[in-house]
Amino acid sequence: DRTNPIALYDDKNKTIIVNKKFDIETIHDKSVLFHELVHHMQFENDIDSNVECIGDLEKEAYTLQDEWLQEKYSVSVWDTIKMNRLFFMMITSCNNY
Protein backbone atom coordinates (compact mmCIF):
# COMPACT_ATOMS: atom_id res chain seq x y z
CA ASP A 1 0.00 0.00 0.00
CA ARG A 2 1.68 3.20 -1.19
CA THR A 3 -0.29 5.36 1.26
CA ASN A 4 0.99 3.38 4.25
CA PRO A 5 4.54 2.24 3.45
CA ILE A 6 6.24 -0.59 5.32
CA ALA A 7 9.41 1.49 5.82
CA LEU A 8 10.86 4.93 5.13
CA TYR A 9 14.31 6.44 5.46
CA ASP A 10 14.58 9.67 7.46
CA ASP A 11 17.81 11.23 6.22
CA LYS A 12 17.73 14.04 8.80
CA ASN A 13 17.83 11.58 11.71
CA LYS A 14 19.64 8.80 9.80
CA THR A 15 16.87 6.42 10.77
CA ILE A 16 14.83 3.78 9.00
CA ILE A 17 11.27 3.95 10.28
CA VAL A 18 9.28 0.72 9.99
CA ASN A 19 5.53 0.24 10.06
CA LYS A 20 3.98 -1.84 12.86
CA LYS A 21 3.09 -4.42 10.22
CA PHE A 22 6.74 -4.84 9.17
CA ASP A 23 7.65 -8.56 9.09
CA ILE A 24 11.33 -9.37 8.60
CA GLU A 25 10.35 -12.97 7.84
CA THR A 26 8.84 -12.01 4.46
CA ILE A 27 10.86 -11.53 1.29
CA HIS A 28 8.83 -8.40 0.57
CA ASP A 29 9.71 -6.67 3.82
CA LYS A 30 13.34 -7.82 3.75
CA SER A 31 13.64 -6.24 0.32
CA VAL A 32 12.00 -3.01 1.50
CA LEU A 33 14.50 -2.84 4.36
CA PHE A 34 17.31 -3.42 1.85
CA HIS A 35 15.94 -0.55 -0.27
CA GLU A 36 15.93 1.79 2.74
CA LEU A 37 19.47 0.72 3.67
CA VAL A 38 20.53 1.76 0.17
CA HIS A 39 19.08 5.21 0.86
CA HIS A 40 21.02 5.34 4.12
CA MET A 41 24.25 4.57 2.27
CA GLN A 42 23.42 7.14 -0.41
CA PHE A 43 23.08 9.89 2.18
CA GLU A 44 26.07 8.70 4.24
CA ASN A 45 28.24 8.90 1.11
CA ASP A 46 26.77 12.25 -0.04
CA ILE A 47 25.45 10.71 -3.24
CA ASP A 48 22.25 12.71 -2.67
CA SER A 49 24.15 15.94 -3.33
CA ASN A 50 25.45 14.69 -6.68
CA VAL A 51 22.19 13.73 -8.39
CA GLU A 52 19.80 15.70 -10.55
CA CYS A 53 16.78 14.75 -8.45
CA ILE A 54 15.46 12.34 -5.83
CA GLY A 55 14.31 10.10 -8.69
CA ASP A 56 17.94 9.23 -9.37
CA LEU A 57 18.30 7.97 -5.80
CA GLU A 58 15.14 5.91 -6.15
CA LYS A 59 16.30 4.43 -9.44
CA GLU A 60 19.55 3.26 -7.87
CA ALA A 61 17.77 1.88 -4.79
CA TYR A 62 15.21 -0.07 -6.85
CA THR A 63 17.91 -1.36 -9.21
CA LEU A 64 20.04 -2.63 -6.31
CA GLN A 65 16.94 -4.03 -4.60
CA ASP A 66 16.10 -5.94 -7.79
CA GLU A 67 19.66 -7.29 -8.11
CA TRP A 68 19.62 -8.40 -4.47
CA LEU A 69 16.24 -10.11 -4.87
CA GLN A 70 17.35 -11.85 -8.07
CA GLU A 71 20.57 -13.08 -6.46
CA LYS A 72 19.12 -14.15 -3.12
CA TYR A 73 15.60 -15.32 -4.01
CA SER A 74 15.43 -15.52 -7.84
CA VAL A 75 12.53 -13.06 -7.93
CA SER A 76 12.22 -9.55 -9.33
CA VAL A 77 11.46 -6.33 -7.52
CA TRP A 78 8.46 -5.94 -9.84
CA ASP A 79 6.88 -9.18 -8.63
CA THR A 80 7.93 -8.83 -5.01
CA ILE A 81 6.61 -5.36 -4.29
CA LYS A 82 3.92 -5.39 -7.01
CA MET A 83 5.21 -2.28 -8.73
CA ASN A 84 4.58 -1.74 -12.41
CA ARG A 85 7.03 -0.11 -14.77
CA LEU A 86 4.88 2.98 -15.34
CA PHE A 87 4.91 3.78 -11.63
CA PHE A 88 8.67 3.12 -11.59
CA MET A 89 9.16 5.58 -14.45
CA MET A 90 7.14 8.22 -12.62
CA ILE A 91 8.97 7.97 -9.29
CA THR A 92 12.42 7.83 -10.87
CA SER A 93 11.82 10.67 -13.31
CA CYS A 94 13.31 14.10 -12.73
CA ASN A 95 10.27 15.71 -14.34
CA ASN A 96 7.51 17.22 -12.25
CA TYR A 97 4.10 15.62 -12.73
Predicted segments, located by residue:
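Conserved aromatic-histidine-acidic binding/catalytic patches
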Residues: K21-E25, D29, S49-C53, L57
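Active-site scaffold of zinc-dependent metalloenzymes
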Residues: D1-I27, H40
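Catalytic Zn2+-binding segment of zinc metalloproteases
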Residues: L37-I54
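Post-HExxH zinc-binding segment in Zn-dependent metallohydrolases
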Residues: E52-L86
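Short alpha-helical catalytic segment bearing the HExxH-like zincin motif
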Residues: H28-L37
